[in-house]
Amino acid sequence: MQDVKTKGHLHPISQAIFDIRSIFEELGFAIAVGPELETEWYNFDALNIPQDHPARDMQDTFWVKDPKNGSMKYEVGSMNGKRSERPVLRTHTSPVQVRYVENKMRQGIKPPYKIVVPGKVFRNEATDATHEAQFFQLEGLYIDKEVSLAHLKGTLEFFLKKFFGPEIEIRFRPSFFAFTEPSAEVDMKWKGKWLEVLGSGLMHPSVLSASGVDPKEYSGFAFGCGIDRLVMLKTGIPDIRMFYNGDLRLVNQF
């Protein structure tokens, strides 16, 4: 009798990233990646986050002691250029948007741009059932002429209904993010409760300018969410830390 070999399993986060990529590829989005070790410019300055914003505090961000400075070519307005060179573990995947657009503009390739960015991010915060020092985030970007909130709404509804099922309800609420204006939180009705699942909005003109795009000619939308949180909702996994403790009893269920 032949030995029956145990088959391997994809980690639920890896499976979710494959599914998310497939959904957005249906809409014509490309997949983009970028460095996890960033400069303060790309992680904060280029995204219109003030240099005195609390998100930059030591208790929220992992700063790198050595090297003390990274590579940064810009100094905009009242921003301190030396500060902008400081290296940091990226706190979100939004810096990839700036790098992607900047690179395309350098090559003379003008919009439209449609990308999604799944990747690992880092936050200097206490861990509990819903918070981890590292987790996976999804970022999305679409830049073209006359991009509107209607494009944003249609894209996110398509994504969430494909990922969770066509029966879900979705609503948009006004909110604030430094890099979008106007901004909206996206809630999903899941098992009878409204839950916040995404942040989104039309790209702030300052962010377009920082990437080399003329905000008078082009507009765009951006959105972001935690992939771990989406997987927790979809699978019923109650604790984000379970994704990272290496317990095969979790992975083997998928």
Label for each model-derived stretch:
Residues 2-254:
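TRNA-recognition modules of translation machinery and tRNA-sensing kinases, especially anticodon-binding
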